Amino acid sequence: RKGYNMTMMKPELLSPAGSMDSLKAAVNSGCDAVYLGGKKFGARAYAGNFDLQELEEVCDYCHLRGVKVYVTVNTVYKDEELKEFLTYIKELYEMGVDALIMQDAGAAKLVREHFPDFPLHASTQMTCNSLADVKYWESQGFNKIVLSRELSTEEIKHITENVEAEI
């Protein structure tokens, strides 16, 4: 993506979805992708997140309409949850989730080792606020990075002009 000024990319319209109704509204309103949480390993544990069966329905509904599905996996797992964590990631991978939004470097390393072609997006919780931060996460296999909200337009421009990852 270096040389960003030469080849402008169309921005992706990404919408949150906390329920099937909000998901359908977002998709029917023209979003390019949705992000949502599952019942496991998501930071919004008490939100109306989707169970595995619902996530499969979400993937089918969205993919039939050309919309991508990103699932947040943005909590830290415990040692005793490792097997459950990897099983959950495998289920998401097999149902066709388009990418995982992650905030834990160790969890991302595990995903990369077990599912090397599963796209990873760096969550805003990773606090990426410099070119060095973005380059680091890019080197760790993240292909999309959500920057810190504190950055100025000029700082964002500088970063996007100097990395391959999507911002």
Regions found by a protein language model. Give the residues of each.
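Non-catalytic helical/linker scaffolds that mediate oligomerization, partner binding
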Residues: 5-167
